[in-house]
Swiss-Prot record:
Protein name in UniProt: Stage II sporulation protein D
Keywords associated with the record: Sporulation
Cross-referenced InterPro entries: Bact_Sporulation_Assoc, SpoIID/LytB, SpoIID/LytB_N, Spore_II_D_firmicutes
Origin: domain of life: Bacteria
Amino acid sequence: MKQFAITLSVLCALILLVPTLLVIPFQHNKEAGASVESEKTAVSTKPASKGAETLKASPVSIPVYRTANQSVENIPLEEYVIGVVASEMPATFKPEALKAQALAARTFIVRLMVSNSAVEAPKGSLVDDTQMFQVYKSKAELKKQWGTSYETKLKKITDAVASTQGKILTYNNQPIEASFFSTSNGYTENAEAYWTSAIPYLKSVKSPWDKKSPKYKATKTFTAAEFQQKLGVKLDGSSAVGKITGETPGHQVATAVINGKTLKGRDIREKLGLNSADFEWKRNGDTITVTTRGFGHGVGMSQYGANFMAKEGKTVDDIVKYYYQGTQISEADAFLNKYMAKK
């Protein structure tokens, strides 16, 4: 009887203990689950990356002359930069290249805001919307151009602009001449080789990526009569066109002689409407074929070079500091305040 009582006591104890033993593992798993959940929440509430920043309202507006309707439109600075980047660089380019273009576009306009432009804009405006300054298109124009891909492309460009908002490129604490072009011949050009003055941060650098650009090579054909008329020269009776007599630091044509007349490479390019001043020519009877390498003046940042750099994993800092040697990325506030004070 005593043994039965002991056995009964043990069974009762086990009955009370088993639920507790069963619950302990589940409580542990529940706590672990809560831990995982809190980690997920922490990740999802991290500050957005630079590329996903929200575009802030611009306190400064740019008076832009819209050539289509011949009127001046005041456009918030960052909205203007979006319209320029969308117009000047393909939206299919890599985000880091788009960021570099945003920095260049913002720097260009901020520099104009605080200094005198060599090119006069229409009355009441700071710039127009053409390549005379920077090409700009409104969101309505971009929607018409892009169609069904409008939302995707606009978001990509807006993210690039937002990630660089308020930032410009400076040299000696001043906004730089942030020139850019489509495709180099494998080298960028010294500023003084294309314009008149040397600029320390616009020096020739290698840009080997550009050889992969669809705009790297092109040909253009002229009749002998067209060629002579456009350049104001007289071809001799030989099979030769002329002789290249000088080369720039960027390996473009500096000078050429045609039947005793010396011409600048830039003038030849502009008068013949060539893609670049790196050219060679060939005469076949009454036909002259000119082959060019590169697209644009070659000074500053190569857009296709920037995109290929981005594809290799280079950042916006890498890109702009490579093409604009010795420059810094700085806040634009001081220059914007100076502009507002003048108004």
